[in-house]
Amino acid sequence: MKKILFFLLTVAFSGFLTLNVTGQSLGGRVTDLDGEPLAGASVVVEGTFQGVHTDAGGYYLLEGLKEGGHRIRYSFMGYETQSREINVTGDVREDVRLKPTAIITDDVIISATRAGDQTPLAYSNVTGEILEKQNSGQGIPYLLSLTPSFVETSESGNGIGYTSLRIRGTDASRINVTIDGIPLNDPESQQVFWVDLPDLASSVDNIQVQRGVGTSSNGAGAFGASINIQTKGIENEPFAEISSAAGSFGTFRNSITAGTGLLKDRFAFQMRYSDLRSDGFVDRTGSKHNSAFFSALYRTGKSLIKANVILGKELTGIGWWGVPKEILEVNRQYNPAGEYTDEYGIVRYYDNETDNYTQNHYQLIYSRRMNDYLSLHSALHYTFGKGYYEEFREDAGYSKYGLPQVSIGEITFDATDIVRRKWMANDFYGLVYSLNYKKDKLDAKLGGGINLYSGDHYGRIIWMRYPGSTESNHQWYFNNGEKREASLYGKADYSLSERLSVFGDLQYRFVNYSLRGDDDDLKDIGQSHSFSFFNPKAGLFFRLSSGQEAFLSLSVANREPTRTDFKEAAGDSEATPRPERLYDLEAGYIFKSARSSVGLNLYGMYYRDQLVPTGELSNVGYSIMTNVEKSYRIGTELTAGFKPSGFIGLDFSFTLSSNKIVNFLERYIDYNTSDWSEEYKSNNLGTVDIAYSPSITGSSDLYANILPPLKVHLISKYVGRQYFDNTMNSERMLDPYFVNNLMIDFEPSLNSLRGASLQLLVTNIFNAQYESNAYGGNWFEDGQEKTWAYYFPQAGTGFMLRLGLKF
């Protein structure tokens, strides 16, 4: 399999490099109205992959153009974009002067945390057009599926409800996520729960995915990847949009979006409301979601004030336990959540085994352009979250809840059936800011943020079969976590010559995290930790020729453990997790021509004290982690696009990697079955694969324009085998899978509408039977290894039909 893939990719790579390297050329200079050069301005041949950026003197050169007319787009942040029809016959010169925008735009909001065109890092930009076409209600991880080294997972099996992601094997708790430059990660778990932001994609303009350490950002430490989301800007004209979808597994999605357009060239308002429902593929993982997005804007010539409100509410059937290995082959939709045996010996399921949560985001953004070179951006943010999950517990011991035994007549009960709720209530607020300077050869940014978090965790028993004197809604535990985080960064791109620029990025980050109170097992988890991190980054960007670029960078990142990491080690100083450090080396090459593009990236990520998953989960579905002294991820990422004609095209990505722990020491208990005595043992397994890190991933989008309004996509995804613990035992391994989706888009031109679209999406068209995630572990009896494992099976063939109307 590897040899076949390598051969096909080599052929494709060779073919891309030989396409369109000869032909006509177009060159010139891009300046402002005073004739000052605009270094780094974008010059793009519309409708093709081809584009370049101006050098330090503002000069550009497009080579390999076909003879004839081309539409060229010239753009630079803070200036009005120009598009020109240019007839290329022979070598043509075209100089362009760009006019400063009279009004500040939304782009300044996210410029400080994003990789620019000359930043020496590996990243992918996902446009709003792509997000809109792929958005059938699935979580954001499924809309980013085609980016390199990306693996998405779903508890319900159909991408709705609880979803998550990994990039280069890096789990979601290490991936920094911002929305309009504002941190989105939960400070304690350091994850983003996309289920709490249903249909967010309908309000997103574009997303940048940075692989590796990336640029300095706000909020949680980026320890392997970053996701930077920009919400939709304000439309100039009034508009309204309606989108409705229905499909397999009882899935329905409806959304309405409307906006006033610019009023008096100063004010604008827009809103979106979405309702999303699904039964899920796995039994009793159905979900109901409601979300709303409100945005109001006021702007003058040099200032912009924007207020965003994002509201999300979800009710989801619990599916985080997965399917036991012994049942997987018999019933892929089995869900053990809420299972119990009644007094007649009949297996039943508690009908309200659900997760219920509300999360609201409030953001106030201010940006001001001081002059043509200097701008200020700042934002205040507040996130409120509150909710619980409810579950039935059979034969729950009174002592585990700090309760006395109950006597009824002459019978004394030490256990009873209960229904309990575990609550979370949290507040997260802060300030982020950046000062941006861009003139001639220098593009510099100074920024940072201060963020505060307080989260309550508590549990209540709402029903007991034999309550005794215990009152309803009895609270059996309470703890609070507080986190304070402050950061300061400075970053700069400087053009040393027409072909070479240098990049530097320095960040200081301070974190204090404290826990107090008892956990659900009644143990005191009180503790406090402080960390100071210095995260330097440096790199070089080379402009080899028109259409060819290369980069090299070295970055350092540090990350503190999560709440679960600390909680699981409470009371054992030797088990207290250590912070992690990552050294990330990236080298890349980019080639673009009119009909093809290729990106080749080599990376080496070397860790000290990396926290890796043991394969086990906590009782709320978090991975239990352990520090390993030395580990690494090295790999090659290939991205390519090929458009031989206006009729057909292909985009694909492929990653080949090696993800290893050096000298992994397995610790386990060996039980003697004669008397069930325990013997603690260890085994040095040498160099092993890191859990959840497939060595091969790949994706592709083969598309054809059948007729002007009709477009067909065959979207494919391959994920190689991956272990779900660190022992490389085939009993605890996810098999490789290859999944194909068919998408048919029909977009007729209707004079009465601004736009209309009808889409049919057929998922998993070959009905592949696969699991995208699992967890488990082992134990020993009389020296013989045993395995326990739970899997998350994904749905077979399904469909979604979607209608969209724009007014």
PLM regions with names:
Residues P198-E241:
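A beta-strand signature from Gram-negative outer-membrane beta-barrel systems
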Residues E498, G604-Y606, T626-N726:
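Gram-negative outer-membrane beta-barrel transporters
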Residues G27, A246-R277, V282-G319, I365-N371, ...:
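Transmembrane beta-barrel wall of Gram-negative outer-membrane proteins
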Residues S375-H381, F541-R543, E549-S555, R578-I634, ...:
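Membrane-embedded beta-barrel scaffold of Gram-negative outer-membrane proteins
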Residues L33, S42-E46, S75-Y79, T89-K133, ...:
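Short, acidic, small-residue-rich periplasmic hinge/interaction motif at the N-terminus
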Residues P141-P183, D205:
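Extracytoplasmic beta-strand/coil segments of soluble accessory domains associated
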Residues L61-G64, R166, P183-R211, Q230, ...:
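Short acidic/polar hinge/loop motifs at secondary-structure boundaries
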Residues L650, G720-Y723, F746-F807:
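C-terminal beta-signal and adjacent terminal beta-strands/loops
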